[in-house]
UniProtKB/Swiss-Prot annotation:
The gene is ribH. It holds the Pfam family DMRL_synthase. This is 6,7-dimethyl-8-ribityllumazine synthase. GO terms for molecular function: 6,7-dimethyl-8-ribityllumazine synthase activity. Keywords: Riboflavin biosynthesis, Transferase. The keyword Transferase applies. HAMAP family: Lumazine_synth. Catalyzes the formation of 6,7-dimethyl-8-ribityllumazine by condensation of 5-amino-6-(D-ribitylamino)uracil with 3,4-dihydroxy-2-butanone 4-phosphate. This is the penultimate step in the biosynthesis of riboflavin. The active site is at H90. 5-amino-6-(D-ribitylamino)uracil binds at F24, A58, F59, E60, A82, V83, I84, F115. (2S)-2-hydroxy-3-oxobutyl phosphate binds at S87, T88, R129. It catalyses: (2S)-2-hydroxy-3-oxobutyl phosphate + 5-amino-6-(D-ribitylamino)uracil = 6,7-dimethyl-8-(1-D-ribityl)lumazine + phosphate + 2 H2O + H(+). GO terms for biological process: riboflavin biosynthetic process. The lineage of its organism: Bacteria, Bacillati, Bacillota, Clostridia, Eubacteriales. One of its GO terms (cellular component) is riboflavin synthase complex.
Length: 155
């Protein structure tokens, strides 16, 4: 008896991807977007198969991601943005709701909706995760999207 194993590959050619970007903290989210596009293209995606939708902030990401996921056009939807802690509880509400919303959309639609939204305590932490010391989390989200899209095609 042999065990069947499913594992997604990292080949993006022939797949279409949606990316939702929160404009708030654009100096970070634009770097995450660049990283996501770079990740997709490096793995074989054609730029014409990538659609980017900008929303005002992280809180608005789930509704745009849901619309894209429900459209049937995309193998996966990547969500990027930055929520940076301030001196009020606003951070906790926004970070919690966007993460729950993204997870729910993925489960409800069966489309991989990838959480690439930074939730950091400081601007410095966000900068580190948007292409400096800690890599680019937008790139990482793109690689995850490719793998999950290919995995779900096998299941």
């Amino acid at each position: 008896m042999s065990i069947k194993t499913n594992e997604g590959n990292l080949i993006a050619s022939g797949l279409k991807f949606g990316i939702v970007v929160g404009r708030f903290n654009e100096f970070i989210s634009s770097k995450l977007l660049s990283g996501a596009i770079d990740g997709l293209v490096r793995h074989g995606a054609d730029e014409s198969d990538i659609t980017v939708s900008w929303v005002p902030g992280a809180f608005e990401i789930p509704i745009a991601a849901q619309k894209m996921a429900n459209s049937g056009k995309y193998a996966a939807v990547i969500c990027v943005g930055a929520v940076i802690r301030g001196s009020t509880p606003h951070f906790d509400y926004v970070a919690g709701e966007v993460s729950k919303g993204v997870a729910r959309i993925s489960l409800d639609t069966g489309v991989p909706v990838i959480f690439g939204v930074l939730t950091t305590d400081t601007i410095e932490q966000a900068i580190e995760r948007a292409g400096t010391k800690a890599g680019n989390k937008g790139y990482d989200a793109a690689v995850t999207a490719i793998e999950m899209a290919n995995l779900l095609n096998q299941l």
